[in-house]
Amino acid sequence: MKIIEGSKYAPGKKFAIVISRFNDFIGSSLLAGAIDELKRTGGVSDDDITVVYVPGAVELPLAAKRIAAKKQYDAIIALGVVIRGGTPHFDLVAGESNKGLAQVSLEYDIPVAFGVLTTESIEQAIERAGTKMGNKGGEAALGALEMVNVLDKI
């Protein structure tokens, strides 16, 4: 039996981080977590990390698609914060963002790590951006690091 696994060490690989500006007071912590994991765990240099800001989570898939089409990056990390309000807007934004990012990954054969928080409250978002529940931005970066190496081995 052959087992294929990827390490989380990927010096020389190039990563694009696409981040939504909406709810930036939380998103900035996700970004810091992602960059920290890429550099500390992945051995990725600053020169191999590009950060692209977009207005909101709905714009993440289009920016990711444009980045993927350029074929200059080994993985994309999508970050954002969508907090449920009193309208169905949350479900539309969260669902379309997730679906669009998955489509980019499959269409362009590139890992697109989903680090978009979809929470019921601001408190839950804060907990997942570096406090009680860890940093989901950092976790998305770890997933991107591992997938880059897994795909290299397949």
Curated annotation (Swiss-Prot):
The keyword Transferase applies. One of its GO terms (cellular component) is cytosol. (2S)-2-hydroxy-3-oxobutyl phosphate binds at G86, T87, R128. It is an enzyme of class 2 (transferase). Forms an icosahedral capsid composed of 60 subunits, arranged as a dodecamer of pentamers. Belongs to the DMRL synthase family. This is 6,7-dimethyl-8-ribityllumazine synthase. It comes from Pseudoalteromonas translucida (strain TAC 125). The gene is ribH.
